[in-house]
């Protein structure tokens, strides 16, 4: 039997999709339309009732929602996700696993790269634990599937988990049966690893999250990176027009021209402060002067600084957070980073760093790519 996965018929969502079921190409061929569909499904993880309603139109049943409501002090390395399936006319089981991006209290988990304290691991342990939790939770379900085909998707935190989960499912069910589309994907693996031609990571090279953990630490991603053409001035009007038609905007459209170089400067400066994983988590930088902090003075690790920046400093308004403002008061190892084009121009209502990471920006530039 022909092995296909069917595009979901999405109605009343972020972008109009074609009616009916349209067969997707090979799992190893990037499909822009399926990518847009996957992004919408991933984004709707924040609205699970809408997600279930929309997918039910195409006959998908919600198998379950998992870890959606977490206490702020929940330190388990698990992901929030939804699982759907349907049986096709040719008796194949189509499974959708949509993994939510960062929720309340999860930024710390995002940056808790090696919770075991083993800094030599060849993978991002925090995200791998979340992927393995999904597999172990649904071991019996997976064992019972007959001729399954999977669509695995996620944005940001969800993308990292989806990247690893997609690789694990591919190892078990073969690449032709596993479609993986991730967006704003953190780095998940380093060293030698198999090539997964069915895993597509849609990347904005101006997005800070796609550089974490630092490439200088050797981290990459499973699969193939599909880099958005955000530095192409000729495509900028098309991307802006597509953005302005979306209902998931988080602020005005922000031009990405020149932002990739600025982001790479920020990442290089951060990596220079933390040349390896252990240094990033253990070395305390003084807050009142450049250099290492002594045992009796205030200090901050590079990891803690990134947590502060991403969970508090990367706000959707022009003003820096209180914690960021306090670090800006004195010269130290971190303050130069806060002035490397961190905040957008005065006439823009959102920080450019935040804007480059948002699903609406990704969707708009994917439209331009098409």
Outline where the language-model segments fall.
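Positively charged n-region of N-terminal signal peptides that target proteins for export
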Residues: 1-4
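Bacterial N-terminal signal peptides
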Residues: 8-16
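Sec-dependent signal peptide cleavage junction
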Residues: 17-25
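C-terminal His-loop and adjacent cap/lid subdomain of alpha/beta-hydrolase
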Residues: 26-27, 56-59, 65-78, 92-94, ...
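A conserved cap/lid and substrate-binding interface adjacent to the catalytic center
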Residues: 58-153, 170-182, 193-200, 292-294, ...
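Gly/Ala-rich beta-loop-alpha elbow adjacent to hydrolase catalytic centers
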Residues: 154-158, 162
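Active-site signature of alpha/beta-hydrolase-fold catalytic machinery across serine-
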Residues: 164-168
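The feature captures the conserved acid-bearing segment of alpha/beta-hydrolase catalytic domains
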Residues: 178-259
